[in-house]
A protein has these predicted regions:
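Conserved GNAT-fold acetyl-CoA-binding loop/helix
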Residues: 25-45
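A short helix-loop-beta-strand connector motif used in the catalytic cores of GNAT acetyltransferases and
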Residues: 47-59, 86
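Conserved acetyl-CoA binding element of GNAT-fold acetyltransferases
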Residues: 82-94, 144-147
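Conserved acetyl-CoA-binding loop-helix of GNAT-fold acetyltransferases
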Residues: 89-92, 98-111
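Conserved catalytic-core motifs of GNAT/GCN5-like acyltransferases
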Residues: 124-128, 135, 140-154
Length: 158
């Protein structure tokens, strides 16, 4: 297999990143359609983040095609009174998931956070991946977020 290259994202990559984000969304939330307007807003946010020093946006390329991305940041966490690193999204095309590329990108995100002065990292993990993260020895389960449809009537009453 030809080498996969990771690099900082550029503004021109943001449309492709948004398409990969939509793929990721469709995998993890097939029951909720991501609106085109939301994708357009995401492109705007990604373009802005490319030039911000506290934002982390990288892409993985194979044969000149973007096959994955990782998105994170560093910001002050008031409750903990410290600088924290965040990893919001990681997505790799299915045919490349066996390569440990996501793991390598996450490790790079952590190292970048350390260099920015962060002393703790937070990772948004999708429900299908939680079991793998819980087994990692260096990670503690910090918070769980649930979502519910506020429009649809539910037959289950609490």
């Amino acid at each position: 297999m030809e080498k996969i290259r990771c690099r900082d994202a550029k503004s021109r990559d943001c449309v492709v990143i948004s398409e990969l984000f939509k793929k990721m969304w469709d995998e993890i939330r097939p029951d909720i359609q991501l609106q085109n307007k939301s994708v357009d807003l995401l492109i705007d946010e990604l373009v802005k983040s490319v030039n911000l020093p506290n934002m982390y946006l990288k892409v993985a390329e194979h044969k000149g095609k973007i096959i994955g991305f990782i998105f994170g940041s560093v910001s002050y966490q008031r409750r903990l009174n410290k600088l924290a690193g965040y990893c919001y999204d990681v997505f790799i095309e299915k045919e490349f998931r066996h390569t440990k590329l996501a793991y390598k990108m996450i490790e790079d995100n952590k190292e970048w956070g350390r260099k920015q002065g962060a002393t703790i990292g937070f990772f948004v993990v999708q429900n299908k991946d939680i079991d793998r993260w819980v087994r990692r020895p260096d990670y503690d389960l910090y918070q769980t977020t649930f979502s519910c449809d506020l429009v649809k009537e539910s037959g289950d009453k609490v």
